[in-house]
């Protein structure tokens, strides 16, 4: 998922540029300057959050650590590893949401980000300690750290999902304001919703040691419903190129859903299936 956020941003930006270049005007009420400024800040915070969450917890790295800790017998020696780097400015931004969110939402965001940062730090610290126990051949203590890291990996996944869920309604409201005059408003919003749902599915599937099948199935049902609604949106005259990209996106979402269903039939995580799903997701938003 290294480039997926950039691809998604490029797709939406293309739609936005096209919508500003002409076409029919909606008759939506004119938003106030304050509403537009708040909506802009919400989208900025959302985009920053996407970048932080992508860099903060790389699911394949987390699973690689767990894979190493799960090995029995003699294992190849490793040195201590550092967690993935995160831009300090962006971390500070997500920990200090502005008053474009209400007080309760700000508290929830700070609480979940603080929990995520703490869980990640403990996860990698535990791995470093695990390596030191291996050198001392203290298998019992090493095993205890594996159990702890199983829990921390799940916590990180939950915190990420919580942030997505908290931001989703605010992002949708902000889009309603900023895209009020865009003839491609509904298409842009449907792309964002489906992309967010696909991210959630990947996040849930990546839980190597504890696949949450029922939640994945619910998200797949949600994505299928979103796709069905997106297919019913009428074509926008004068924006043939953008509509072609939109239809391509919908086709790739269909492929993604089929790939998830195939992976779910196996009932367990595999790196190959995770790569397959990630590839299908990235292809959908190129």
Q: Which stretches of residues belong to each language-model region?
A:
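N-terminal Sec/ER secretory leader and immediately downstream segment
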Residues: 37-145
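A cross-kingdom marker for long, charged
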Residues: 221-286
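Secondary-structure edge/capping motif, primarily at the C-terminal ends of alpha-helices
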Residues: 53-67, 98-104, 127-138, 174, ...
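Extended amphipathic alpha-helical interaction segments
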Residues: 142, 146-247
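C-terminal motif of bacterial Sec signal peptides marking the signal peptidase cleavage site
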Residues: 16-19
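Bacterial N-terminal signal peptides that target proteins for export
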Residues: 1-8
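Bacterial signal peptide processing site
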Residues: 21-24
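Polar/charged, Q/E/K-enriched amphipathic alpha-helical segments with strong coiled-coil propensity
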Residues: 124-154, 263-278
């Amino acid at each position: 998922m290294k480039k997926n956020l950039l691809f998604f941003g490029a797709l939406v930006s293309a739609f936005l540029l096209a919508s500003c270049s002409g076409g029919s005007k909606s008759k939506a009420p004119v938003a106030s300057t304050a509403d537009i400024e708040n909506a802009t800040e919400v989208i900025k915070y959302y985009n920053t959050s996407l970048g932080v969450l992508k860099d903060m917890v790389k699911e394949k790295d987390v699973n690689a650590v767990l894979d190493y800790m799960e090995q029995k017998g003699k294992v190849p020696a490793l040195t201590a590893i550092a967690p993935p780097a995160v831009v300090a400015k962006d971390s500070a931004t997500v920990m200090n949401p502005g008053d474009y969110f209400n007080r309760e939402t700000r508290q929830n965001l700070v609480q979940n980000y603080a929990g995520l940062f703490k869980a990640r730090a403990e996860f990698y610290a535990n791995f470093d300690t695990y390596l030191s126990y291996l050198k001392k051949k203290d298998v019992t203590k090493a095993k205890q750290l594996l159990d702890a890291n199983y829990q921390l990996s799940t916590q990180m996944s939950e915190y990420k999902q919580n942030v997505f869920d908290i931001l989703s309604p605010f992002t949708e409201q902000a889009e309603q304001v900023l895209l009020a005059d865009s003839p491609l408003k509904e298409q842009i919003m449907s792309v964002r919703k489906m992309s967010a749902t696909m991210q959630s599915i990947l996040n849930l599937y990546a839980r190597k040691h504890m696949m949450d099948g029922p939640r994945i199935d619910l998200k797949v049902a949600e994505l299928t419903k979103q796709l069905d609604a997106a297919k019913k949106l009428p074509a926008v005259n004068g924006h043939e190129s953008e509509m072609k990209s939109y239809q391509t996106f919908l086709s790739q979402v269909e492929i993604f859903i089929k790939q998830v269903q195939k992976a779910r039939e196996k009932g367990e995580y595999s790196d190959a299936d995770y790569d397959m799903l990630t590839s299908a997701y990235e292809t959908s938003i190129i």
